Amino acid sequence: MLTYPQIDPVALAIGPLKIHWYGLMYLIGIGGAWLLASRRMKRFDPSWTKERLSDLVFWVACGVILGGRLGYVLFYNLDEYIANPTLIFEVWKGGMSFHGGLLGVMLAVWWFGKRHGKSFFQLMDFIAPLVPIGLGAGRIGNFINSELWGKVSDVPWAMVFPNGGPLPRHPSQLYQFALEGVALFVILWLFTRKPRPTASVSGLFVLCYGIFRFVVEFVRVPDAQLGYLAWGWLTMGQVLCVPMVLAGIALMVWAYRRDAAQPKAA
């Protein structure tokens, strides 16, 4: 059994002002995505400036935060937030939905593309390899917050979490960090080293994320207010991942078929 590192969720306190690690992880994710995007920007569009890139990252970040929070409210805990609406603004306590964040990003990208003459999938393909940076940082934030831990286990790397009872559990946040953060980043980085059909990068992203998340849900404790939805093992996260996997496969098939049907330059 490993020892859980006792990390204060508050990274810095200045009088009444408290800066939480969870919020800092989002800033790290957004900053890391911007740095990587600035390296890839000229390959994407030589006419782009740092100002336009910053504009895109800003709106995508808004989509992540607003969509992620509203998605959690709608998908996971609607009754509690209806009863206590002010809880919606307490984001430092956790409670973000990746699937809601993805919908928020899609809306932001569609709007940005309309303004700047880029297609939806051109922008999504550019953004997709950047997302694992934020996903990985967010999972570290979950770990520090001692939330979203896994089921009771006797594996050698199990941990006793401060608010998870006396028994050791799977550190499922670290599994998600390794898969959604590190592995997904490497897969997309290698895949985009050479030109790919439009929408194929987006398709690979949602396919891999859906698979990784579906698998980890088997060892992660479901949200207490929902529990298992069916068969004693199906979680809301898995339900939301099924359409992602199907959409990812469909996007990749469509992208490559569309590319093959286009006339090639002599």
Curated annotation (Swiss-Prot):
GO CC term (a single one): plasma membrane
Keyword terms: Cell inner membrane, Cell membrane, Membrane, Transferase, Transmembrane, Transmembrane helix
Top-level taxon: Bacteria
The protein's annotated pathway: Protein modification; lipoprotein biosynthesis (diacylglyceryl transfer)
Organism listed in the record: Pseudomonas paraeruginosa (strain DSM 24068 / PA7)
Protein family per UniProt: Belongs to the Lgt family.
Subcellular location: Cell inner membrane
Main location group: membrane
Amino-acid biosynthesis recorded as keyword: no
InterPro entries tied to this protein: Lgt
Record's bilayer topology term: Multi-pass membrane protein
Role summary: Catalyzes the transfer of the diacylglyceryl group from phosphatidylglycerol to the sulfhydryl group of the N-terminal cysteine of a prolipoprotein, the first step in the formation of mature lipoproteins.
Binding site for a 1,2-diacyl-sn-glycero-3-phospho-(1'-sn-glycerol): R139
Gene Ontology MF annotations: phosphatidylglycerol-prolipoprotein diacylglyceryl transferase activity
EC number: 2.5.1.145
Residue intervals passing through the bilayer: 10-30, 56-76, 92-112, 120-140, 171-191, 199-219, 233-253
A GO BP entry: lipoprotein biosynthetic process
Pfam families: LGT
Protein name, UniProt field: Phosphatidylglycerol--prolipoprotein diacylglyceryl transferase
The keyword Nucleotide-binding is annotated on this UniProt entry: no
Lineage: Bacteria, Pseudomonadati, Pseudomonadota, Gammaproteobacteria, Pseudomonadales
